[in-house]
Design a protein with these regions (language model features):
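Domain-level signal for Mg2+-assisted phosphodiester chemistry and nucleotide/NA-binding surfaces
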Residues: 1-96, 150, 268
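Extended two-metal-dependent nuclease catalytic cores across DNA- and RNA-processing enzymes
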Residues: 22-23, 74-250
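Short acidic/polar active-site loop segments enriched in Thr and Asp
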Residues: 50, 193, 279
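Low-complexity, acidic/Ser/Thr- and charged residue-rich accessory regions of DNA metabolism proteins
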Residues: 231-232, 236-289
Length: 289
């Protein structure tokens, strides 16, 4: 049995910028929502998709914005995209999916929490997202990332091959090299290659010596790297905290059975399809009744 966890925020962004725009009868832009509805419906046609949860950033800001002023916000998001977040959540719910609309936490936190809670109860957890933050959740072949657009699966060896560090060190990697998508600046001069080398040896930021003379590996520019980290170690630890996904999100589902997909909600889906001007989908979806 597999548990599929969907990154609704990523999917909505992908559809908004990748699918044709479309307006409903009221003149509202709904193209991304129509696309995500079709995409999720297609996913549910797969025989191995039996238990599913989808997380959305109901608001972009989270507890991380209270920790660091430079962390990502909703500023600059296209209004036509932002207006479709509630519709996309409705679409997922109408399909009968468990939906986690995050406010205090982020969508990625919900996916990490669900993974931690249910990974040992299934054969595999498939996190449908290419987001590098989520690589920290990968565990052997039990928990994998699946980029649906490119149909690429990352298990633990693949994460190491791609990023140079094991999943557990992904927050350390992002803290040091930075993550522009999340507003994490990183530590000056710490590039991806040198950071991977250092973390491969020491495992975590906390274990990296301040004094370059104490390093027992050869890394280009080691003196500068050590000096910069020593000067900004407190910042680095904050960035690591920002990059570390929370697994203590209070998800209401306590049993794997709560995530079983039993079919779409006929009344809700018919109403939503009428709003979106989407009619052909109703012929393809299995309903709970």
């Amino acid at each position: 049995m597999k548990l599929h966890l969907l990154d609704g925020t990523y999917e909505l962004f992908r559809m908004f910028y990748g699918a044709p725009p479309s307006q409903n009868d009221a003149g509202l832009e709904v193209g991304a929502t129509r696309a995500i509805l079709r995409s999720f419906a297609m996913l549910l046609e797969r025989e191995d998709v039996t238990h599913v949860g989808v997380a959305f950033d109901h608001v972009i800001e989270s507890f991380r914005n209270e920790l660091f002023d430079g962390y990502k916000t909703g500023a600059g998001i296209d209004e036509a995209l932002w207006a479709q977040f509630p519709l996309a959540e409705q679409a997922a719910a109408a399909l009968g999916l468990v939906v986690w609309p995050m406010v205090e936490f982020e969508a990625d936190d919900a996916l990490a929490a669900a993974t931690a809670r249910f990974a040992d109860e299934v054969d595999q957890v498939v996190i449908a997202s290419p987001d590098k933050d989520l690589c920290q959740c990968v565990r052997g072949e039990r928990v994998v990332l699946w980029d649906r657009r490119r149909d690429i699966v990352l298990d633990e060896p693949a994460v190491i091959e791609k990023h140079g560090v094991p999943p557990a060190a992904i927050p350390d990697l992002l803290a040091l090299i930075g993550d522009s998508a999340d507003g994490i600046p990183g530590i000056p001069r710490w590039g991806a290659k040198s950071t991977a080398q250092v973390l491969t040896r020491y495992g975590a930021i906390e274990q990296i010596p301040d004094d370059e003379g104490a390093w027992d590996i050869k890394v280009r520019g080691a003196k500068t790297l050590a000096q910069n980290l020593a000067a900004q170690r407190e910042d680095a630890m904050l960035y690591k905290r920002l990059a570390t996904l929370r697994t203590d999100v209070p998800l209401p589902q306590t049993s794997l059975a709560d995530l079983e997909w039993r079919g779409a909600d006929r009344e809700a889906l018919e109403a939503l399809c009428a709003t979106l001007g989407e009619t052909s989908l109703l012929e393809r979806v299995r309903f709970a009744d």
